[in-house]
C-alpha cells in the first residue's frame, strides 16, 4: 500500500482526477460540437449546390 506523507494528498489527487475527467468531457463535447457543425456546414453546402445546379439547369 502506498504511503502518503501529506494527509491532504488523497484530496488533491481526487481533485486532479476530477479536473482531468472534466477536461476530457469538455474536449469530447467540443469535438462532438465541431463534428455536428461540420456536418451541418456540409449539408448546407450540399443543399446550396443542389439549388444552384437546379437553378442553372432551369434557366433558358
From Swiss-Prot:
Amino acid composition bias (Low complexity), ranges on this chain: 29-49
Region (Disordered): 27-50
Name of this chain's protein: Putative uncharacterized protein DDB_G0284297
Species assigned in the record: Dictyostelium discoideum
Biological classification of the source: Eukaryota, Amoebozoa, Evosea, Eumycetozoa, Dictyostelia
Amino acid at each position: 500500500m502506498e504511503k502518503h506523507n501529506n494527509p491532504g494528498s488523497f484530496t488533491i489527487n481526487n481533485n486532479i482526477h476530477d479536473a482531468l475527467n472534466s477536461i476530457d468531457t469538455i474536449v469530447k463535447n467540443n469535438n462532438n460540437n465541431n463534428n455536428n457543425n461540420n456536418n451541418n456546414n456540409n449539408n448546407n453546402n450540399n443543399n446550396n449546390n443542389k439549388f444552384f445546379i437546379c437553378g442553372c439547369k432551369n434557366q433558358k
